[in-house]
């Protein structure tokens, strides 16, 4: 297991359990978020879609103090054409985080969706070479990433990478390829918080999620935290959510990030109620 150390500026993040990385509509009340956005010990983050920040009367940095590109840091967005690198969208969010001195999360290195289509045409050996090249390119571009979603949505029935054989396939643990991905990420970013991220974790596939993350942890994978996507919270009671979160945390005993929280309404009053 990797040593739990990160760059000094973000060292406190590993103790922020649960910290929040929300994909949600912004509330109209900036005052409610201003206290969190200026708190150095915790953060409430959001996504940026096509770098849609600081438009209108409310500035992103007054509402949130963490940023994640929704699509711009995915492999297909950056290398849709083989060796045709497009870093512009990711650069915008990365530089914005630097400017305002809050964490940037890279989402994501390995996923069974939004990866380059040309990868499917390659042999397993060539796929591995391309994965190495991809991670090396990200490392060269962003050597100081504080947080990384290393693998996304690999619970059975979700979207495990079709190219997983290039990383060793299921192997003895059933998730050898995920372990390999974390090892490769740790080699390049030994001080980053390395995260496994998935959905349906609070309700429908909680046990499968726990099994996957626990398998990684017990196998010695350099995983620092897990992200529980929160798309399914809108119709979940507070007591049920608390019970599910306690069950997950007791089983895994690792830092948790509540990620990708959606509030499917444009009604500000209802959004405020949901946040509370």
Where are these regions (language model features)?
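Alpha-helical scaffolding within the catalytic cores
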Residues: 50-62, 86-93, 133-134, 138, ...
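Substrate-binding cleft and catalytic face of glycoside hydrolase catalytic domains
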Residues: 62-80, 88-202
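Boundary/entry segment of secreted carbohydrate-active catalytic domains
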Residues: 35-70
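Active-site clefts of carbohydrate-active enzymes
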Residues: 108-109, 114, 193-201, 230-232, ...
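Bacterial N-terminal signal peptides that target proteins for export
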Residues: 2-19
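Aromatic- and acid-rich polysaccharide-binding/catalytic face
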Residues: 64-71, 146, 152, 196-198, ...
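Acidic-and-aromatic substrate-binding clefts and catalytic sites of carbohydrate-active enzymes
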Residues: 45-58, 75-88, 115, 155-158, ...
